[in-house]
Amino acid sequence: MYGNNNKKSINITSMFQNLIPEGSDIFSRRCIWVNGPVIVGAGPSGLAVAAGLKREGVPFIILERANCIASLWQNRTYDRLKLHLPKQFCQLPNYPFPDEFPEYPTKFQFIQYLESYAANFDINPKFNETVQSAKYDETFGLWRVKTISNMGQLGSCEFEYICRWIVVATGENAEKVVPDFEGLEDFGGDVLHAGDYKSGGRYQGKKVLVVGCGNSGMEVSLDLYNHGANPSMVVRSAVHVLPREIFGKSTFELGVTMMKYMPVWLADKTILFLARIILGNTDKYGLKRPKIGPLELKNKEGKTPVLDIGALPKIRSGKIKIVPGIIKFGKGKVELIDGRVLEIDSVILATGYRSNVPSWLKDNDFFSDDGIPKNPFPNGWKGEAGLYAVGFTRKGLFGASLDAMSVAHDIANRWKEESKQQKKTAAARHRRCISHF
């Protein structure tokens, strides 16, 4: 038996089962009926939807390719990481952070919080189960979700989940972005994506090139310096660097508050004026600002400003060097667009992540080619034919939580309405279905 909340489940798919003719290939794999939604992904977004459904008494199942919840946080983040925003903007619905947690919890505290969240709502994902494809079957009006489950020493097993609703909760950061630099294969030194970076201890005394100047690139560069390395950070394009706090108040919170009372352009001008007072002119350190303000840039393009947590003073003093774009790599060196050639020992690619939705969600017009819903926040959580999305707002955990509540509420209403049309008895199961939920 698979799934959660089984005691409360009501079979609302019996009418579809009765309509399916004998011999239909809808049961070509080991098949599992799900009487509620299938949630793909057990990160914060998937957990938030699951908790909302639990509160509504709606059965569901979560499929997670990793062996744990929040695998991005557990397996692909560096040790010194802390939340960049105050905890009240990062908590999931209906479950605040513990009072004793600091304003900016550590990575390990956040993982602890998520594990407590899952335990509190009795959320039990199916781990080590990778979705190969999900496709809406127009003939039967159902979703067909095909997976491969890694069962350890028992090998792997293929399943097909049949459901009325599917929630895509794999998020914006499912796959690493690894640029194809000329000559990188001949470099000969250590090359690592920031997702595999844990600590700068192994780089003591080494010259390290950090490619990327977002929050990860800045923080990795600072961590490298603190561990005795000599970091150089590649900055190809304009970037907004802001203080994490302005006069003791979170910059993010200040921006949110200002936008309630003034237009975005004025809020941007105010924040940039205050940032210049605190940080100085970042242009002269090689960190040129974009032409449009940080709040407008975030709203239009989803680009997050860098919140400085200590890297900028090291950049000012030259302890973290800023270098321009890359032309190509060579044996133990890199050639830059300004003509300089740097000798380096290691490369860390702080080049970010992307959605992997296009690789498995088939025949849909809801997501763009880059795996993000075409409709921007706050209208990007609901598609057609029972398709939902959470974690693609480009507004972090706060935006994901808002979408999760909308999704859970909408599915619960539809599930309850369909439940009324069914007899509240155990429904007949198709003879070829190996399990029922």
UniProtKB/Swiss-Prot annotation:
It catalyses: indole-3-pyruvate + NADPH + O2 + H(+) = (indol-3-yl)acetate + CO2 + NADP(+) + H2O. Its EC number is 1.14.13.168. Pathway: Plant hormone metabolism; auxin biosynthesis. NADP(+) binds at residues 212-217. One of its GO terms (biological process) is auxin biosynthetic process. Involved in auxin biosynthesis. Belongs to the set of redundant YUCCA genes probably responsible for auxin biosynthesis in roots. This is Probable indole-3-pyruvate monooxygenase YUCCA3.
